[in-house]
Structures are given as structure tokens and as C-alpha cells.
């Protein structure tokens, strides 16, 4: 016989499953609304069960880089994943619940508090984890998606919560909610109906080399792929684009070895400018995740990644201590770049945030360039929910900034994202090829 406590937990788990489906590859984004309506109640058991199951299912893909490529024993990897999910669920849902108690569990206070904690979680600790933000789901909803443009993904999260909890509000709260949502709907309608594609007269080639991560981690195997990558670049150059773009860490040698081992790519850059990712080792033997603009056979500009991935590109304090026991944590920490920049090219400017950096709305906005090319290597996640969630963040950033985004992914998918967040042309996951687009 189910007790009331069991029923609360089960309702929370069901809400968590609906939440996961809204962020899954199935892209059932509309399920976020019933998920929140079912999961958010004054009962902590239901709320925590909702948060834990939602984050656990939605982040289960993290096991792939840990176990398959980090060589971490599953008996260590899965408990580590559970601890991460426990931390995130207590942070997002537990902290919101504690603040909610101060407001005597007013349902109208919940959207404000949850969104406030989302903002906090996106910045702290270790630079934050702006993943699984509720507002992301608006990117597929016409009219409402322009809420993201009006106030970034955080205003989107607030609106998602207002809509989801609307039936639980009293009369005054419903009127106030409508007073917030109605102007945003009008703004979105105006934006949708006045949308026009600007023609820049540019032709861009994106290259998806599809080098699996186990190959990239083996220097000898990766070097065998170099010829295939160069052939793709040659074919792209033959199409006479204004720019060729390759993904993050695209070549099997360091930036400092470019003149010795990358003569072919330098020669090709004399015909067409090339943007590509490299691992760079500085004079102090510290690595950087770097993007370079090659033109006229030399490096014209470079951007060093600023927002590094904790436990992926550096081990934060105090976890370095555990590197003695967990070999995965014993890698050399990457250095951070110190400033964003736009590459100036043929009369237009292009920014190149790398991989995880696309998750940060204000950081991406700070580039201030005419176009954004996100260089990434999602081979770490294969064809998982993580890869889908990552590209969806680029779609959100596109509509926030009302700019074309180029999503250049090693293993795919890669694509062209319009200023209203739509993928207008793409290469599927697992394909090797060239994506040409004129705009």
C-alpha cells in the first residue's frame, strides 16, 4: 500500500521524466510545462524527487566521457555522477525551496526564486553550470521564443514557470502574470511578422571531419586522419567560399608545429581564409584551447578559450588532491585566455567562442561581432543527449543576439542557425563532409 510520502515521491519522479523528455533528443519541449506543474509543490520530497530525477536522466550522458574516454572505473564514475546530480538538485531545487519557505510558499514567488537560483548556478561555483535552464525550451515555440531576445534565457525561464504554475495562482497573481506575459507576446508577434533575412553576400564552408574521440586521443591514429581532413579543406577551397571553418582542435599537431607539419593548410589559406581550432602550448609549456584565423599563409589572429570546463580542462581546488587516486584528474590544466575578440575579415567580423562557452548568454553577447562561429568537438559525447543539448544552446544564443550562428562540430551535427534560432542547413551526426551556405 502506497503511503502519502510514496505518492509524493512518485509524482516527483514522473515530473522528472517529463522534464528529461523536454531536454532529450526527442525534443518534446512542450512537456516542460506539465513537468513543472506536476513537480512543484510545497512538499520537499516531491520537489527533491523531481529535481534529482530530472537532472540525473538529463545528464546521464556524462558517463560517456568519464567511462569511455576518461578510463574511469564505472564503480567510481557512476557514484561521481550521482554526487554531481545530488549537488545540482540540492543547489537548484533545495536552495529554491529554502528561499520559498521565507515567502511562506507563495506559488507566485517560486518563478522569481527559481530563476534567481538559475542565474546563481550559471556563475557559481567554478564559473557555473548554465545547463538545463528552463528557458531553453522556448526556442522551438514561435512568438514566445522572442522572450529570449527580450531578456535572455533567464527571462525565458521565468516565463516558462509563470505559464506552468498559472493554474495555481490566485486571481491577483494571474492578472499580474498576464501583465508580464502579454507584452512579451506582442513583442514576439512583432518580431515574427517583421523578420527578414539580411543578405550579406557571403559564402561560407563549414567542415565536419568526423574524427571519433578514441582516434583523437591516439596521436598516431589521429595523424593518419590528417590527409582526409586536408582533402576536405581542398574540396571546400575549390568552391571558392569567402571563409572555411573547421572545428575545435581539428588537427593532430600543436599550433607551434603548424609551420613544420601544417604546410598544406597554410598554402590553402593563401587562397581562402581559414578559421580552425588548435591546442597551443606557450613558452611556459602551458596549454591553451585556441582558435586561429589563417590567411595568406600565416596566423593573422588568435583567440584563446576563456570559459574552461571544470574537470575537463582544469581540476579546480581542492579536487587536485584526488589526482593521486583518480588518474583522469592528473592532466595538465589548461590556461585561460584573457579577452574576447572579433576576427576582422573582408569587411565583416566574426567571434569564435569554443565549445562550453556557448552556454553563457552574457559572455557570448560580449563578443559583439556580426556573426558567431562556435567551434566544438562533441565526439566526447557521441550521439547522446549531451550533443543535442549543446547545439540547442547555440540556437538560444542565436535568437538572444539576433545573429547568424555557425555550429562547427567535429562529429556532428554541424549547421547554420538563423537569427531566430532555426537550423536552416545542417550535416547529420556521423557524417564527414562540407556544408556550404551563402547569406
Swiss-Prot record:
Pfam families: CN_hydrolase, LNT_N
Positions of the CN hydrolase domain: 207-439
InterPro entries: Apolipo_AcylTrfase, C-N_Hydrolase, C-N_Hydrolase_sf, LNT_N
Record has Acyltransferase as a keyword: yes
An individual GO BP term: lipoprotein biosynthetic process
Entry's Gene Ontology molecular function annotations: N-acyltransferase activity
SUPFAM superfamilies assigned: Carbon-nitrogen hydrolase
Major site of localization recorded for this protein: membrane
Enzyme superclass (EC): transferase
Active site location: 248, 305, 355
EC number assigned by the record: 2.3.1.269
Family assignment from sequence similarity: Belongs to the CN hydrolase family. Apolipoprotein N-acyltransferase subfamily.
Function text: Catalyzes the phospholipid dependent N-acylation of the N-terminal cysteine of apolipoprotein, the last step in lipoprotein maturation.
PANTHER family for the chain: APOLIPOPROTEIN N-ACYLTRANSFERASE (PTHR38686:SF1)
Protein name: Apolipoprotein N-acyltransferase
Source species of the chain: Aquifex aeolicus (strain VF5)
